[in-house]
């Protein structure tokens, strides 16, 4: 009888193990197929693909521009130029955080525009807001390059100093773009961004993260790209209570950055999404721009 019981238990464990393996494989298959939806939740919050606030709602004059990428995607974007002598002011190229669209970031853009007197150019990535296409790492890299090239060909912005600003996944976009275009960019500002998508997986999936990471096709290897940035000033802004991107990843990126003009500032009380509300946030940025002579006209 004992032998029969042992055999029964063995069979239960065997089939339980097989069931667990099957569930794991199904989960991995789901993640592999839908990981772009998980990495780029462009439809969240509800209505984000249809409803895009405009700068006029925030008392900013603007031009809406549709950019065409080399792979035939149309990007929705806003350009806000200073009303007086815009050619003498720096231009902010803004890459927003995940979810939502560029319109949701206009309250932040307004501070850069009104308080720091910067021209501001912001895009909705492909698959976000009213931009066409579907988001991917390769696609967002094309989008960012398209945006920079537009500024470099613009009759006013081409005469200004370009400051690239990226939040969260926008930081990864900003790092990749800057690493390739250091002679065209005057400064880089990063907020709460990560070392790589693979490094983020254990935070999102604490169990089985090492296995799941092997199936990850969206890489965003910022820890490799940041090493290449040596020619321009870089400002790192980190919320110490960030619950999405572990703050040590920002510290690591700072350490790996090859620039001699890098600066790190942390905000002890801030989480992932409210760091820009931290005490002195925009003053830190203003001081950084002044220290690196960014507020003067481009030569």
From Swiss-Prot:
The UniProt record lists the keyword Transmembrane helix: yes
InterPro entries linked: AB_hydrolase_1, AB_hydrolase_fold
Cellular localisation: Membrane
SUPFAM superfamilies in the record: alpha/beta-Hydrolases (SSF53474)
Main location: membrane
Keyword Transmembrane: yes
GO molecular function: palmitoyl-(protein) hydrolase activity
Spans through the membrane: 15-32
Keyword set, alphabetical order: Membrane, Transmembrane, Transmembrane helix
Protein's job: Suppressor of bem1/bud5.
Family (UniProt): Belongs to the serine esterase family.
Protein's name in the database: Protein bem46
């Amino acid at each position: 009888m004992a032998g029969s019981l042992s055999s029964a238990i063995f069979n239960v464990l065997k089939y339980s193990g097989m069931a667990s393996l099957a569930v794991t494989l199904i989960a991995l298959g789901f993640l592999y197929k839908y990981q772009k939806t998980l990495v780029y939740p462009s439809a969240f919050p509800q209505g984000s693909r249809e409803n895009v606030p405009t700068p006029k709602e925030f008392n900013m004059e603007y031009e809406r521009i549709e950019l065409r990428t080399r792979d035939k995607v149309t990007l929705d974007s806003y350009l806000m130029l200073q009303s007086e002598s815009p050619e003498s002011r720096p231009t902010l190229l803004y890459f927003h955080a995940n979810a939502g669209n560029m319109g949701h970031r206009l309250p932040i853009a307004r501070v850069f525009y009104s308080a720091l007197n910067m021209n501001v150019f912001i895009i909705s990535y492909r698959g976000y807001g009213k931009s066409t296409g579907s988001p991917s790492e390769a696609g967002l890299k094309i989008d960012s390059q398209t945006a920079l090239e537009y500024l470099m060909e613009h009759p006013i912005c081409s005469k200004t100093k370009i400051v690239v600003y990226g939040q969260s996944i926008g930081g990864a976009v900003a790092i990749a773009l800057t690493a390739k275009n250091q002679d065209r960019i005057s400064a880089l500002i990063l907020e709460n961004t990560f070392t790589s998508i693979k490094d983020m997986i254990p935070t999102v999936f604490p169990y089985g993260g090492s296995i799941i990471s092997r199936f990850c096709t969206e890489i965003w290897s910022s820890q490799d790209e940041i090493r290449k940035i040596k020619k321009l000033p870089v400002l790192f802004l980190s919320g110490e209570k960030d619950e999405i991107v572990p703050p040590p990843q920002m510290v690591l990126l700072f350490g790996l950055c090859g620039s001699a003009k890098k600066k790190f500032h942390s905000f002890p009380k801030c989480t992932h999404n409210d760091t820009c509300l931290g005490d002195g946030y925009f003053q830190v940025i203003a001081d950084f721009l002044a220290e690196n002579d960014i507020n003067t006209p481009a030569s």
